Structures are given as C-alpha cells and as structure tokens.
C-alpha cells in the first residue's frame, strides 16, 4: 500500500458555540467552550489515521504547552510525528465561533506554522516513492508548498492540494498536481468565477485545467462535490444529515479521500467514501473530535 504524507499546519482550536455569529463590533453571549487539536494539516492527518492508515505528518510547532499537547495527541492517533519540527515561536492557535446551524467563522494565528521552511521538509520528502500520496494545504508558507509539489511530483507521487485558506497558486505549481480540491470560495479565488451550481463549477474547473491541473474536485457543502477530469464533469452528491459543526468537514473529506486512493480505489468511488466520512463529521462538535473511524464510515 502506498504511503501517505501530510504536510501542513498544526493548531490548537479554541471553540465557542453561540446561537449566532457576532456582527462587526458586537458581543454575543456564547455557550459551550471547547479546546482541542486542530489545523488543516493536522486534521487531515488524523482523518487518514482514523481511516486505518499509517500517515507521516510534517509540521512545525512551538516549544510550548500547545506544541507538547499536539504531538502527544498525534501519537495517540498513531501518526508518525518524527518529522514535526520544533520552532522558537508560539504554536498555531485558531479561534473558532460556531452558530446554532453549525456554520463557523475562524481566525488563525499561524505562529510556528508560518516558519515551516522548504529545508525543514526535505528529510521527509526523501522518503517519498513513486505512487505515494502527498497532501498539502495553504496554512504554511507558499514557498514551502511550491518546493514540496516540485520535488514530490518529480518523484512520481500523487500530489493533492487542498488550497485552503483561499490564496492564489502559481500555474507552475498547479501543473504538477494530481488533484486540487478547493471549496466554492477557494475556487473563486483561484479562477475569478463565483461557484454556485454545477454550471459555474464546470466553468471554474475548466479554468483550472487550462492552468495545468489534471483533475479538479470542487466541494460545495450540502450540494456535494463536483469532479472534473478528462474533459467531463460529474456531481458527487452529499449525504443529508443534521449539521452540528462544519469546522473540519473539508479536512475529513480530504483525509478520507487520500486513504481511499492509497488503497487503489478509483477516484469517483473514493469521493463517495470521502462524502460519507465528511457527513458523519458534521454531526459532531469540534475538529479532530468529530472525525469518524473507518468502521463508522464503512457502516454509514
């Protein structure tokens, strides 16, 4: 079975739930408070591990209590933490507000994540073999993302970029990807096309393909996900559930997708698997605490 390497952010999530999100300049009395592991990279690595796969996680944390707790938590999930770098900066922290409908607003202090350099990730990249899967996001410096994509793709790895948070990515990097997985907002940032339905998703996907991407999956919340490859598009429906917290839905989707692909599952079938994992996660509070087990996904 091919290896899965996740390179990305490690945060501590501080979550406050309230009936609605505050407007600018407004204070809202919240309800429950929760603190747990987070960060897009970490969430995706945990999702891979929860699907029953070994995963190597490459990240940067501070020499502080948050960094200590994060590494211990990853080890408890069975994640290989041997390439997590310690930095003389605070560990990343995310402040998350969740409303009564499960929608969220997030502000991230990147801290040590912002100092993960191309040099830091080189020892991990030396382990990559042809057919391995490398999963990246954009909560680390773009120079590090670009270097990873160049080296991993040259080694024959399947490089998957979840371009979150939304940012412009160079055509050079896009052309080396096996797959890109933006949500609607991220797809608009990358293409300038507002994605609201299947037709606009196809236009955005075609624009990305024209920039060199081979395959595009645009996640569209409750509408599902739009897959475009080989000049054809198809909608992968989402499962209807009652959402409690959507914080890590995209991360669970990407992690489960990589797990399925590592098993040799065809892309369309892997996306159906990812949709099930993501659907389960939004019915639970928190990021990493919401991630289902492999058995739960198989039985969904």
Residue ranges and their predicted role:
Residues 26-28, 35, 50-132, 150, ...:
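Conserved N-terminal subdomain of the carbohydrate kinase-like
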Residues 49, 153, 262:
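Gly/Ala-rich phosphate-binding loop of Rossmann-like dinucleotide-binding domains
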Residues 46, 93-97, 224-227:
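Short beta-strand scaffold segments in enzyme catalytic cores
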Residues 1-4, 168-173, 198-300:
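Conserved phosphate-binding/catalytic region of the ribokinase-like
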